[in-house]
Amino acid sequence: MSSHIQIFDTTLRDGEQTPGVNFSFDERLKIAKQLEKWGVDIIEAGFPASSSGSFKSVEAIAKTLTTTAVCGLARCVKKDIDAVYESTKAAAKPRIHVFIATSPIHRDSKLMMSKEEVLASIKEHVSYAKQYFDVVQFSPEDATRTELPFLIECVQTAVDAGASVINIPDTVGFSYPKEYGEIFKTLQESVHADHDVIYSAHCHDDLGLAVANSMAAIENGAKRIEGTLNGIGERAGNTALEEVALGLYVRQDHYDNQTQINLEETKQTSDLIARFAGIRVPRNKAIVGQNAFSHESGIHQDGVLKNPETYEIMTPQLVGVKTTELPLGKLSGKHAFAEKLTALGYDVDPEEQKTLFKQFKTVADKKKAVTDRDIHALIQGTEHEQNAIYKVETLQLQFVSNGLQSAVVVIKDIDGNTYQDSSIGTGSIVSVYNAVDRIFDRKTELIEYRIDSVTEGTDAQAEVHVQIKIDDQIVTGVGIDHDILLASCKSYVEAHAKYVANTKVEEGIHS
């Protein structure tokens, strides 16, 4: 019988450390609900002591989820541990993740602590956390660059203090599979406990080895894997959890371990996080990329048509990729639309459904067929506008002279106040963005501008992603519309609105 591998998702904590990614409160709740639906065992919902915004979102997630454990991150600082307790105490399964750096470079350059001081801190704070939590996870940060004898001491100290989960972070993606696996083997042989201890792997992808290292950890006794959807995270990212889940499923003959992941929800979960993060999934990304089940070669196409197993080790349907769908059209009624929402996993109240149906009809008048991706985009766009503190009211453009364009932008805030300004630029989008900058009275730097087509065809909706820098803060925005210029304006206004919201959030503990 296969053993169970726990999946610990840190998309909302480590994943949000991706430059430019800043999930809103509502986005974090939606992601948490979808992760529970996907079947993860534990969600690391945030770092509650870092800000009041993080505390509130962790608290809301803890109150919302019913089956998934909700975990908060804490340094070896009592105020951090208190913040995790207060924010997660309403959870069905509250958890805490306590960490301290243990490698020589971190001890000497960051912590300014001796080995003895680090060990004393581990004992004090794991013991303190154990007073509030049945399950305490401890991580020796930068474990793979920590002297192995000292790493064993740190883990033994944490276990003696009550830790029942030991996580081994490859914090800078430094290790390789054989070495990383040996660390797990050595720790299990060397550390003694009077209670059950689960060993966990947390890998970064700086050398492109995060998933390989995680699988090596499983081969050497790890029973929990930490990571993110789509592998997002700071620098080169984290272990892509969907790759681990499918790797264990497809190669059960080798690993003899399984997760409780609902594989059919994989693509929808990946797409949701990609949209909210504003990070497009690469076409050639394993499992969830657009090319994952595409075959261009004539030989490959011939083989797949005769027998899909010739070139496919898993089916698209396994991960929720639909090869056929019944699109809606302008003649589709309220009942068909409601059934489509349910089929796509949306739980929408009757009043909101009426609003969405009107917007669906507007889209249907412009498109021959409204696909599932159109519906996802419609709902995302509606949610963005409903929750926005500023939204675009009108946009007017006209040609001036000598290649210059002029734009007039009118936006409305959440209280109903309107703001208007105009500007010129060397192109339509430049003039629009200059006008928006004038409204907000901010100097910005446009870092990234990207147009995605929601679906194929000339009648497709445009999804515009922007990343801008304001006062050394990077923020992102998404805008969806049939008109590319209006979608561009919406995305830019949303990015500005995020900056305004972020600057209003009270900063938390920093020490």
From Swiss-Prot:
Location within or outside the cell: Cytoplasm
Entry's Gene Ontology BP terms: L-leucine biosynthetic process
Enzyme class: transferase
Keyword Iron appears in the UniProt entry: no
Subunit structure: Homodimer.
Catalytic activity reported: 3-methyl-2-oxobutanoate + acetyl-CoA + H2O = (2S)-2-isopropylmalate + CoA + H(+)
Entry superkingdom: Bacteria
Function: Catalyzes the condensation of the acetyl group of acetyl-CoA with 3-methyl-2-oxobutanoate (2-ketoisovalerate) to form 3-carboxy-3-hydroxy-4-methylpentanoate (2-isopropylmalate).
Keywords: Amino-acid biosynthesis, Branched-chain amino acid biosynthesis, Cytoplasm, Leucine biosynthesis, Manganese, Metal-binding, Transferase
Listed name of the protein: 2-isopropylmalate synthase
One of the record's GO cellular component terms: cytoplasm
Cofactor list: Mn(2+)
Residues annotated for Mn(2+) binding in this entry: 14, 202, 204, 238
Domain (Pyruvate carboxyltransferase) ranges: 5-267
Top-level taxonomy: Bacteria, Bacillati, Bacillota, Bacilli, Bacillales
InterPro entries in the record: 2-IPM_HCS-like, 2-isopropylmalate_synth_dimer, Aldolase_TIM, LeuA/HCS_post-cat, LeuA_allosteric_dom_sf, LeuA_bact_synth, PYR_CT
Matches recorded under Pfam families: HCS_D2, HMGL-like, LeuA_dimer
GO MF annotation terms: 2-isopropylmalate synthase activity; acetyl-CoA C-acetyltransferase activity; manganese ion binding
Organism: Staphylococcus saprophyticus subsp. saprophyticus (strain ATCC 15305 / DSM 20229 / NCIMB 8711 / NCTC 7292 / S-41)
HAMAP family in alphabetical order: LeuA_type1
EC numbers for this chain: 2.3.3.13
Principal location class: cytoplasm
Pathway in which this enzyme or protein is active: Amino-acid biosynthesis; L-leucine biosynthesis; L-leucine from 3-methyl-2-oxobutanoate: step 1/4
Protein family per UniProt: Belongs to the alpha-IPM synthase/homocitrate synthase family. LeuA type 1 subfamily.
Region annotation (Regulatory domain) ranges: 391-511
